[in-house]
Amino acid sequence: MPSRPWLLRLLLLMLAAVALAWLAWLGRPAEPARATPDGASATPQTPGPAQQAAVAAHGDRPEGMAAAAEPASAAPASQQPRLKPVMSEADWAAFDREWCAAMQPAREALRQGGLAALEKLPPRPLVDDDIQAAAGSQLLRRLSQALSARASPRERAVGLWLAGREAELLAEAQATRDPVIVALAAQRLRGEASAQATRLWRELEPTNMVALLHAQAIDPRPAAVWLESLASATAYEPHLTTVFQILHSVPAPTEGSPAALAQDIALVGLHAAWPLFEVGQLLKPCRRPESAPLARQCAAVAERLWALKPNDTFSPRIAFALVRAQPALRPAWEARARHAEAMAQLEMDGIDDNIEELMLRSACLAPPAPKGIMSERLRLGDAVYWSGRLPTDPAALDALVSRHRAARGGKSLLDAPPAAPTAASAPARP
């Protein structure tokens, strides 16, 4: 792998940041795309005869778009892909061709020397950052419009959330009393609207641990009372996987295209920006239990959380933090910690393992064996996706655990995380 896989990492970070920008722009009119010198952004380019022949030969697959874009590489400077305030399917097809033309140097480098050859490219992105971000925002707006027009209340609710129509989302949650819609409103609305949805969520799913954890922020009960209710939970369901399955039900303008890549990465950004419940108040009494009954409650909540098998890689860390102050429990939790550490390391490795696939996609080349890490992970949920990829060989599992602990200064997840220079200003973490 090249020492500077920054091209893809920049693409990932840039388009993931689209999610944050999108949340700030919700409900506002579409802003004009970046103007082009010739003012031609209002009309998509029509492919010439050679480009039409390439598309006819390959269709709309990545290799077809790349072939159609090749003649543009002779231009003195690459033409940046152009966006309109409102994009039709034809506009997206033109955007894909123009993206592929701009990425021609990267495509040639990959063809000739693989990832290592990208080192020779100039550091400036071949497609401007603001165009990447604008494309992601446009595609999220397209998702919102498609979902808002559907008949399913859940799909409409996801569309309302993306559109920033908060009052309508809260009204939909209260009218339908659908736990998925109510959970979405509780987790994504703000202020009193979120509090109203959270109270309704707890009413509808009183034994859902995630609903209870969100409710503790608006209902300051004694720690022992909260721990007792959490220990009796029968589910751990944020309904996040359902939301992202709905988001993935809207196909990109063209499968395998640059726009499809931009949409995938924008959804990853939404997933990464999903708010977590505050765990500080839950963990505080368990960091140094003041009594044996309180220590037993902390252990009971940890056991319950583990048994409910959260479909993410973050929540098990809460269980480890709950029992961290009780050394006598460590033997019972060691195998669980090793499993979580192996999966966490596999997740970290997965980022690098899929760099080549995403590099190829960004350069309009078809990956030889697509892994679909972004879309599949969000569709299935983190825990299901990564646990299904754990090696069965004990030695391979041990190697993953060893590497994970090495990155934590030799510490297990059952140990307190290594101190960081900015730990004092960082939020509490398990």
Predicted regions and their residues:
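Hydrophobic membrane-insertion alpha-helices, especially the h-region
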Residues: 9-24
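Juxtamembrane proline-rich low-complexity "stalk" or linker regions positioned immediately after a signal peptide
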Residues: 28-86
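Helix-turn-helix repeat elements of alpha-solenoid scaffolds
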Residues: 107-111, 116-141, 158-167, 186-195, ...
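Alpha-helical repeat scaffolds
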Residues: 139-146, 165-175, 192-203, 222-235, ...
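Short helix-capping/linker turns of helical repeat alpha-solenoids
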Residues: 150, 175-182, 205-209, 215
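Alpha-solenoid helical repeat scaffolds
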Residues: 154, 158, 183-186, 209-216, ...
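Extended amphipathic alpha-helical segments with heptad-repeat/coiled-coil character used for oligomerization
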Residues: 212, 216-265, 269-280
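A cross-kingdom marker for long, charged
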Residues: 287-430
